[in-house]
Amino acid sequence: MTHLSDLDIANQSTLQPIKDIAASVGISEDALEPYGHYKAKIDINKITPRDSKGKVVLVTAMSPTPAGEGKSTVTVGLADAFHELKKNVMVALREPALGPTFGIKGGATGGGYAQVLPMEDINLHFNGDFHAITTANNALSAFIDNHIHQGNELGIDQRRIEWKRVLDMNDRALRHVNVGLGGPTNGVPREDGFNITVASEIMAILCLSRSIKDLKDKISRITIGYTRDRKPVTVADLKVQGALAMILKDAIKPNLVQSIEGTPALVHGGPFANIAHGCNSILATETARDLADIVVTEAGFGSDLGAEKFMDIKAREAGFDPAAVVVVATIRALKMHGGVAKDNLKEENVEAVKAGIVNLERHVNNIKKFGVEPVVAINAFIHDTDAEVEYVKSWAKENNVRIALTEVWEKGGKGGVDLANEVLEVIDQPNSFKPLYELELPLEQKIEKIVTEIYGGSKVTFSSKAQKQLKQFKENGWDNYPVCMAKTQYSFSDDQTLLGAPSGFEITIRELEAKTGAGFIVALTGAIMTMPGLPKKPAALNMDVTDDGHAIGLF
């Protein structure tokens, strides 16, 4: 049987005018800033909130295969299923990054009949948010280098500048660069480097800000580097927070689009979950809560990364409790964690599913540690067999875990009704949500708590550099920030080859980064990179554009 590609399905779909999508959730035309017929920015100052806030349903996943387990697909499909059940619902997603689109993912707007549209626009440049973030980030780099060139009144030590330039592309050649070469008229030579845009602190700040004032305040607190006597230098010292916020004045507005089935969708912000906090913007989520009874959102990769950061960083900052959490599982991921090679994942292997279930079990138990009841969604693939699916269902029944088979990729919202009904039962019950740790704990104890309670590790080792940073950060008053772990998404450990549910391992923190504007400390583990590289055969090799301007090869 031949299946249509995601792009073919998207191109065959009929979109509703964006003003009609807006009207369906009470957004007036006065609050709408259209970008063509099917996309718009929302002026949140012109929205009238309802008396009660909508409930948040978080979608996370087990540890993924390199291809991903369809978390965005399930997120969109679940929202469509609520729509099918006549619920007042919105979906809130992150924006895709261009780098991974051309690298391995080929796009990130859901899949099959559970997509947000217009798919081409969202996957490419959308409404320009990432370009604005890239520009603001690199403008700050220019201001720093100019300040040093013009006499360096603040005494910035160019050997200790923490701020890097960014680009929305996977480009390993730019990880380490030298700038200011070519003589005195070209600035002061120093070492620099590039991160991918989604790792920029500006991205994190945009996603954690509640208003332009809040955005400006957070930008002003960014630590760009240190003086020669190791005192922090901030954007406020450079006096450019106003200029940077001005660049972002439109980017901070949430973007309204729609699913194939006409469910309103806010797609805004896009930090990665392995190198940043992995959640869409607070503004988009809160705007959706002002307009809908149920808001379905997602956090990147598995519960050990995106969901943990959603609970400990985003929900804490925003001041809301998730009403339910969906953990997406696939038969292929279970088999991979059960020891099956990636080339053999399409073959039936119930024993491997049994062996790999420990990975899903740990993710389920992790969610319970936050005081929220999880619901497992088996995201159906055409190569799954009845025996494999039945084993997972029987495991769930034996362990008193809610579970539903979802077929939203093939059937859209109708394929997610069973999951939606399970989630409805959960959100109607009270929960006892609480973050994993208190902010008053020392940084090293917060890191140890994540490693031992969420990852299953036994010990944290800090490099000599990280130990010095812990001491310095405490002296600077940064000890009460939450922690954002930078770790491989493929394993609970910092070794991506250690699959399943390993225990007793040690995790090494090689370096810490103070994101004082965003308000968290990044702990870098293993070989994690903040500027990815492209694979040997990038998805770009299969991409093209037709003579009439339509994309080919997005998926």
From Swiss-Prot:
Gene: fhs
Reactions it catalyzes: (6S)-5,6,7,8-tetrahydrofolate + formate + ATP = (6R)-10-formyltetrahydrofolate + ADP + phosphate
Biological or metabolic pathway of the protein: One-carbon metabolism; tetrahydrofolate interconversion
Family: Belongs to the formate--tetrahydrofolate ligase family.
InterPro entries associated with the record: Formate_THF_ligase, Formate_THF_ligase_CS, P-loop_NTPase
Gene Ontology biological-process annotations: tetrahydrofolate interconversion
Annotated positions binding ATP: T65, P66, A67, G68, E69, G70, K71, S72
Protein name per Swiss-Prot or TrEMBL: Formate--tetrahydrofolate ligase
Native source organism of the sequence: Staphylococcus aureus (strain bovine RF122 / ET3-1)
Pfam families associated with the record: FTHFS
Keywords: ATP-binding, Ligase, Nucleotide-binding, One-carbon metabolism
PROSITE patterns attached to this UniProt entry: FTHFS_1, FTHFS_2
Gene3D superfamilies: Domain 2, N(10)-formyltetrahydrofolate synthetase, Formyltetrahydrofolate synthetase, domain 3, P-loop containing nucleotide triphosphate hydrolases
EC number(s) reported in the record: 6.3.4.3
Alphabetized GO MF terms: ATP binding; formate-tetrahydrofolate ligase activity
